[in-house]
Amino acid sequence: MSHVPSLSYREIIHALQHDGWIVIRQRGSYIRLQKHVGNRTMKLTVPAHRPVKRSTLSQILKQAELELNKFLKLL
């Protein structure tokens, strides 16, 4: 398994949008995204930081139910 890279929030959001996530709002330095999966709605918060910490990105991927390899292909 690869190591989680250090990326900017714009790169992360761009990849998540390719996976079907939609930006619903931004408040301050936090961006909210959501995705409808079946009969449930998943929500994420991505901090608008450059770069986003690798541990934070790891938690975002867990919440998004995305594996690192698939995420890296979306970049």
Residue ranges and their predicted role:
Residues 23-59:
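A short, structured beta-strand/loop element
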